[in-house]
Amino acid sequence: MNNLSLSLAADYKAMVVSNPFDGSPVGEVMDMPASSATPLIDTALLGALVARELPRHERARILEATASGVEADRDAFARLIVAESGKTLKQARKEVSRCINTLKLSAEEARRNAGEMIPFDAYAGSESRQGWYTREPLGVIVAITPYNDPLNLVAHKLGPAIAGGNAVVLKPSELTPLSAIKLVGCLIDAGLPPGVVSVATGGAALGKALVAHRAVRMVSFTGGFVTGEQISRIAGLKKLAMDLGGNAPVIVMADSDLAAAIDACVSGAFWAAGQNCIGTQRILIEAPAFDAFKKGFVEKTRALVVGDPADERTDVGPMISEAAAKRAEALVNEAVDHGATLLFGNLRVGSLYSPTVLENVGCDCPLWYEEVFSPVVMLQSVGSLEEALTLANELQYSLHAGIFTRDLNVALSAAKRLEAGGVMINDSSDFRFDAMPFGGFKYGSMGREGVRFAYEEMTQPKVVCLNHTGTGASVISPGKTTTSF
């Protein structure tokens, strides 16, 4: 929370956070109206004055102490993620571990990334000058995070922003705000000064008001393409960083290790019930390997346990809502009606939607060209690498792609030609290391995340140039006289 939220809590109605699996209440937060945007930003403006003056070692200490706080309470964090998002316990535990790593990486960035010297004497006429540039804070950043990674994606915005000396107004998804609030509590316990991070809980009207506020210098958004377009229209002259979605292809060549490819693609397709912007959605298999891959993939999918995400044995939990599961079901039914073959799945009970595998989905079907964001994957036989690359590159989303092959030349050629922000060789599209640059080509994103790269997005360079010409001397250049100190 924040001091503003606590002082106004009595004036706002409650917003209930529900468990996607059984609908039970998990907690309540304030449903803050659009009118709260200005006081939130005013608080952040004061916090920004404090944040920019925090020594780098203190920023790093706070982030490291926060990582330790999350570590000490990791089981409670994991169970909260399960309760509010529907992720399975094993998936939630992995997310907590990644959050700890993200915070530690951010602490390292606070100490390391401070600019560099500039060789002014590299060009004639500047021999008397020396200087450097530093990375300076932007000021107030609005960070908007989604429901599918309710803890680590928050850390990916707060960590680099704090490392860079900024203040942040964080608007977590109204579906999963509790993990974010708990993380901010750890930051406060670690000594983060008041106003440096505020939490804004509410719906779209609040988000629009925050994005449109003139005092905000940057909006960092992870979410859907439609919302991203709306933000770009109303933000005005602000820096924007966005991760907007994906429809990730994976190419499987006939010479690949099929067992490894099947294991990786099953995980890549169905992790977090497919609610994953780099999740594997289309698998393009070279024809000689297609039947064997299909058989093994369906067998592995059939073995997945679907059910209560709090059960240690569960592999696939619910989607975020029954409406989301119904959307997936409708897209699959439409594809089948237009000639696709259902190989497994398409069973729904409430918000639970079974892992679903299809083949021969038409390229004109929404299931093929939209981001499905559900546990649905399509298999497609291809005659060559060229055909696979054409199909892989034809869509507007382009975060990650993957290719399986034993041929290094094929792998490197595909990596060069795939239009994606990241190409995973002998891995599914669903691999992300929190230190690497993360983003896409085309409409997949604007800017990059990954701690170092987000730090650079959230700071700005300032050049300092010193002209030292000797005591009492002066330098005369055509049309200009410069006198030394």
Swiss-Prot record:
Cytoplasm keyword on record: no
Catalysed reaction, written as an equation: L-aspartate 4-semialdehyde + NAD(+) + H2O = L-aspartate + NADH + 2 H(+)
Positions with a binding annotation for NAD(+): T145, K171, G245, E371
Induction: Up-regulated upon growth on canavanine.
InterPro entries: Ald_DH/histidinol_DH, Ald_DH_C, Ald_DH_N, Aldehyde_DH_dom, ALDH-related_metabolic_enz
Protein EC: 1.2.1.-
Keywords linked to the UniProt accession: NAD, Oxidoreductase
This protein's record includes keyword NAD: yes
Cited Pfam families: Aldedh (PF00171)
A GO molecular-function annotation: lactaldehyde dehydrogenase (NAD+) activity
UniProt-annotated catalytic positions: D243, C277
PANTHER family in the record: ALDEHYDE DEHYDROGENASE
Function: Dehydrogenase involved in the degradation of canavanine, the delta-oxa-analog of arginine, allowing growth on canavanine as sole nitrogen and carbon source. Probably catalyzes the NAD(+)-dependent oxidation of L-aspartate-semialdehyde to L-aspartate.
Annotated family: Belongs to the aldehyde dehydrogenase family.
Protein name as it appears in the record: Aspartate-semialdehyde dehydrogenase 2
The organism of origin for this protein: Pseudomonas canavaninivorans
